[in-house]
């Protein structure tokens, strides 16, 4: 029983502990409970605000990422267009240069043909004039010399031909 008296509280002890507890509870609720609850409310509000700000920041970041992706896609399209235009311009320039070179080559070839034809005609004209002059000279020499027989004529013509070949 001695042990049981140590564990079982007495009525007076129980009464005073209850009174002290209630007074402490009243004092805490009157003076400490309000500031503690307001501090807890402020902390809860600040945490809620921080979470809202984080959600808003996340949404803003997602929006910026979407905008960034759209801008990158637009830049890629623009780059591809510029490259295609540059390739097209280069191809056009090369084709124009080929056409111009071909035209210029044809013009030079035609000018060379005309020049060659002119030179050929001039040379033929000169040869004809020379042949005519030679024929006239030969005829003149033949007519000056009276030829009596065919043998002398052949000999004279052979000499004149050799003379013409040497000149």
Swiss-Prot record:
<keyword id="KW-0066">ATP synthesis</keyword>
<dbReference type="InterPro" id="IPR002146">
    <property type="entry name" value="ATP_synth_b/b'su_bac/chlpt"/>
</dbReference>
<dbReference type="GO" id="GO:0045259">
    <property type="term" value="C:proton-transporting ATP synthase complex"/>
</dbReference>
<feature type="transmembrane region" description="Helical">
    <location>
        <begin position="15"/>
        <end position="37"/>
    </location>
</feature>
<dbReference type="GO" id="GO:0005886">
    <property type="term" value="C:plasma membrane"/>
</dbReference>
<keyword id="KW-0375">Hydrogen ion transport</keyword>
<keyword id="KW-0813">Transport</keyword>
<keyword id="KW-0138">CF(0)</keyword>
<keyword id="KW-0997">Cell inner membrane</keyword>
<keyword id="KW-0812">Transmembrane</keyword>
<keyword id="KW-0472">Membrane</keyword>
<dbReference type="GO" id="GO:0046961">
    <property type="term" value="F:proton-transporting ATPase activity, rotational mechanism"/>
</dbReference>
<comment type="similarity">
    <text>Belongs to the ATPase B chain family.</text>
</comment>
<keyword id="KW-1133">Transmembrane helix</keyword>
<dbReference type="InterPro" id="IPR005864">
    <property type="entry name" value="ATP_synth_F0_bsu_bac"/>
</dbReference>
<dbReference type="InterPro" id="IPR050059">
    <property type="entry name" value="ATP_synthase_B_chain"/>
</dbReference>
<dbReference type="InterPro" id="IPR028987">
    <property type="entry name" value="ATP_synth_B-like_membr_sf"/>
</dbReference>
<comment type="function">
    <text>F(1)F(0) ATP synthase produces ATP from ADP in the presence of a proton or sodium gradient. F-type ATPases consist of two structural domains, F(1) containing the extramembraneous catalytic core and F(0) containing the membrane proton channel, linked together by a central stalk and a peripheral stalk. During catalysis, ATP synthesis in the catalytic domain of F(1) is coupled via a rotary mechanism of the central stalk subunits to proton translocation.</text>
</comment>
<keyword id="KW-0406">Ion transport</keyword>
<keyword id="KW-1003">Cell membrane</keyword>
<dbReference type="GO" id="GO:0046933">
    <property type="term" value="F:proton-transporting ATP synthase activity, rotational mechanism"/>
</dbReference>
<comment type="function">
    <text>Component of the F(0) channel, it forms part of the peripheral stalk, linking F(1) to F(0).</text>
</comment>
<protein>
    <recommendedName>
        <fullName>ATP synthase subunit b</fullName>
    </recommendedName>
</protein>
<dbReference type="Pfam" id="PF00430">
    <property type="entry name" value="ATP-synt_B"/>
</dbReference>
<comment type="subunit">
    <text>F-type ATPases have 2 components, F(1) - the catalytic core - and F(0) - the membrane proton channel. F(1) has five subunits: alpha(3), beta(3), gamma(1), delta(1), epsilon(1). F(0) has three main subunits: a(1), b(2) and c(10-14). The alpha and beta chains form an alternating ring which encloses part of the gamma chain. F(1) is attached to F(0) by a central stalk formed by the gamma and epsilon chains, while a peripheral stalk is formed by the delta and b chains.</text>
</comment>
């Amino acid at each position: 029983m001695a042990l049981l008296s140590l564990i079982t509280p007495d009525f007076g002890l129980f009464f005073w502990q209850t009174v002290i507890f209630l007074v402490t509870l009243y004092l805490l609720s009157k003076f400490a409970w309000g500031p503690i609850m307001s501090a807890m409310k402020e902390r809860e509000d600040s945490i809620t605000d921080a979470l809202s700000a984080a959600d808003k920041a996340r949404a803003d970041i997602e929006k910026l990422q979407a905008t960034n992706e759209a801008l990158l896609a637009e830049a890629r399209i623009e780059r591809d267009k510029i490259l295609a235009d540059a390739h097209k311009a280069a191809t056009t320039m090369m084709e124009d240069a080929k056409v111009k070179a071909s035209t210029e080559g044809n013009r030079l070839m035609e000018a060379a043909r005309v020049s060659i034809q002119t030179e050929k005609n001039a040379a033929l004209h000169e040869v004809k004039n020379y042949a005519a002059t030679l024929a006239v000279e030969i005829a003149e020499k033949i007519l000056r010399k009276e030829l009596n027989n065919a043998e002398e004529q052949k000999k004279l013509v052979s000499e004149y031909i050799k003379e013409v070949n040497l000149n």
